[in-house]
């Protein structure tokens, strides 16, 4: 039986900032873009969450909810450095590490003989070493597969471990909300609710044919996950070809100036996503896509020099967006 651990750092960016500046401890802290530039919150600590602040919220709204919020500009180089240190700790227990982002990863510790081969004890040891050596906390989920390990890591946050043993899987998934299943967003959840499904137990009662009829191939996957079955291996390499962010506006942007004003918010979200991906990812070009009111679209791109020019250059994105906007009349 496999022993999979999903490790997830608690409020990673904010925790690193509090480590660097202990005076921030106990105060509401968020990392994100400037409110004046329509920035968004990348993450916030638990003190800020008490006021309703959360990631992906506009910085302006966050400051309305919590006027005393300390908003810090992201330091991606620092976060990547801490992420490398985090992975060095993981390597003490296994080489089978699948990074999902800077602050989370899957570990297959099935062959690890440390701590009597106990996945729970290994997870607790990792948490202790991270706290003692890096000055931040992580939460861990231990289970026979990746799906359940990821669900479990969120169960005892912050700074906790939750274990789903093989013998407990059946009882655990019966009451698990279908919203916890990967790939089930609001739209899919509503479609399932119309079928009378709110929990994995409800999902188990539906015939596979019904699920395939309504959800195609994903219906088979839903059926497996509802039973707590996930055979995906921990992959030590993940190839990412691109990273992007886009937004569809309720009203068409009126002109070139409006398009350029929309860039900072998109760049803040892109920065947040970029900072979370593997430290091995290297950006080689920037691109901007603009879709017009008639549903035609155009894309402009520009390579990033090998000289080390930062991948994020606001002026470049402004210029590309403006040039793309002017193409609509051609």
Which residues are covered by each model-predicted region?
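Gly/Gly-Pro- and Ser/Thr-rich, intrinsically disordered tail segments characteristic of DNA damage-repair
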Residues: 1-214, 218-221
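DNA-contacting surface of Y-family translesion DNA polymerases
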Residues: 6, 180, 193-329
């Amino acid at each position: 039986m496999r022993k999979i651990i999903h490790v997830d750092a608690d409020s990673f960016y904010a925790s690193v900032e509090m480590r660097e500046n202990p005076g921030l401890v106990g105060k509401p802290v968020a990392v994100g873009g400037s409110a004046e530039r329509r920035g968004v919150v990348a993450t916030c600590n638990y003190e800020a969450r008490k006021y309703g602040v959360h990631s992906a919220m506009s910085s302006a709204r966050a400051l309305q909810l919590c006027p005393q919020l300390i908003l810090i500009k992201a330091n991606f180089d620092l976060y990547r450095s801490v992420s490398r240190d985090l992975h060095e700790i993981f390597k003490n227990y296994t080489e089978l590490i699948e990074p999902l982002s800077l602050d989370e990863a899957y570990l297959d510790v099935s062959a690890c003989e440390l701590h009597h081969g106990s996945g729970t004890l290994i997870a607790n040891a990792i948490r202790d070493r991270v706290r003692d050596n890096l000055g931040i906390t992580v939460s861990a989920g231990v289970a026979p597969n990746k799906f359940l390990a990821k669900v479990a890591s969120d169960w005892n946050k912050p700074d906790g471990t939750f274990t789903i043993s093989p013998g407990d899987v059946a009882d655990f998934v019966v009451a698990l909300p279908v919203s916890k299943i990967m790939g089930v967003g609001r739209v899919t959840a509503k479609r399932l609710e119309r079928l009378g499904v709110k929990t994995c137990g409800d999902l188990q009662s539906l015939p596979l044919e019904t699920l395939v009829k309504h959800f195609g191939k994903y219906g088979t996957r839903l059926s497996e996950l509802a039973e707590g079955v996930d055979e995906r291996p921990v992959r030590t390499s993940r190839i990412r070809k691109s990273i992007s962010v886009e937004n569809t506006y309720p009203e068409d942007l009126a002109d070139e100036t409006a398009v350029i004003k929309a860039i900072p918010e998109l760049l803040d979200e892109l920065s947040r996503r970029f900072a979370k991906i593997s430290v091995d990812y290297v950006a080689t070009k920037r691109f901007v896509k603009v879709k017009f009111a008639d549903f035609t679209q155009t894309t402009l791109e520009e390579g990033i020099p090998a000289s080390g020019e930062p991948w994020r250059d606001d002026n470049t994105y402004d210029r590309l967006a403006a040039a793309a906007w002017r193409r609509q009349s051609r």
